[in-house]
């Protein structure tokens, strides 16, 4: 039986974490874990952040310093979307035209929330490390960084079927801003940072 490592600390991302973060991205997805999904999913939902905005990436690492969860953030949605179109979507297209088509549509418009919530985040934690308070600690670390950088708000999308996630974001203080597709959009205001 595999021993579960339950201790975890929050720290800044380092380059040696990249493969672990890609694995967490795949292991925590609701998509079927096919070979194609394992290839394009980290490109779509992980690589931009670790390659272009790593100062906005925090991990929870177990007692062996192996990443078991993360929060990723793009502090500027417009810059994120442009880079996705220029660099990452072409890579995804070579792997899966269907994924490319869906993501292209998702990334093609800047929503009306941009002015108030210019940043967005993704958070994933391996199941064995969930419900331990690590999600809140990851978001705390990110919020502190966003405030330092004078970012006024951050948003995220959570599946409407993810009851634990919905509860977590509400308890943390995120405000429900609306719905899009099968997701609930949450926002967190950091205040005016002049």
Q: Each predicted region: which residue ranges?
A:
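Conserved acyl-donor/pantetheine-binding loop and adjacent beta-alpha core of acyl/acetyltransferases
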Residues: 77-122
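Residue-level recognition of the GNAT/N-acetyltransferase active site
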Residues: 122, 126, 159
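Conserved beta-strand in the GNAT
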Residues: 59, 66-75
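Active-site rim helix/loop that mediates acceptor-substrate recognition in acyltransferases
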Residues: 36-57
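C-terminal "cap" of GNAT-fold acetyltransferases
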Residues: 152-163, 171-173, 177-194
């Amino acid at each position: 039986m595999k021993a579960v490592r339950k201790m975890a600390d929050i720290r800044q991302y380092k380059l040696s974490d990249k493969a672990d973060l890609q694995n967490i991205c795949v292991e925590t997805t609701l998509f079927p874990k096919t070979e194609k999904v394992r290839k394009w999913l980290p490109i779509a939902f992980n690589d931009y952040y670790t390659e272009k905005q790593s100062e906005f990436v925090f991990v929870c690492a177990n007692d062996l310093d192996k990443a078991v969860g993360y929060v990723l953030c793009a502090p500027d949605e417009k810059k994120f979307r442009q880079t996705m179109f220029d660099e990452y979507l072409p890579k995804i297209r070579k792997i899966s035209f269907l994924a490319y088509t869906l993501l292209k549509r998702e990334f093609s418009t800047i929503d009306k929330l941009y002015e108030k919530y210019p940043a967005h985040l993704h958070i994933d934690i391996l199941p064995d490390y969930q419900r331990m308070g690590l999600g809140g600690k990851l978001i705390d670390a990110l919020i502190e960084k966003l405030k330092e950088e004078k970012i006024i708000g951050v948003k995220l999308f959570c599946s409407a079927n993810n009851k634990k996630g919905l509860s977590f974001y509400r308890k943390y203080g995120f405000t429900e801003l609306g719905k899009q597709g099968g997701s609930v959009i949450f926002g967190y205001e950091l205040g005016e940072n002049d």
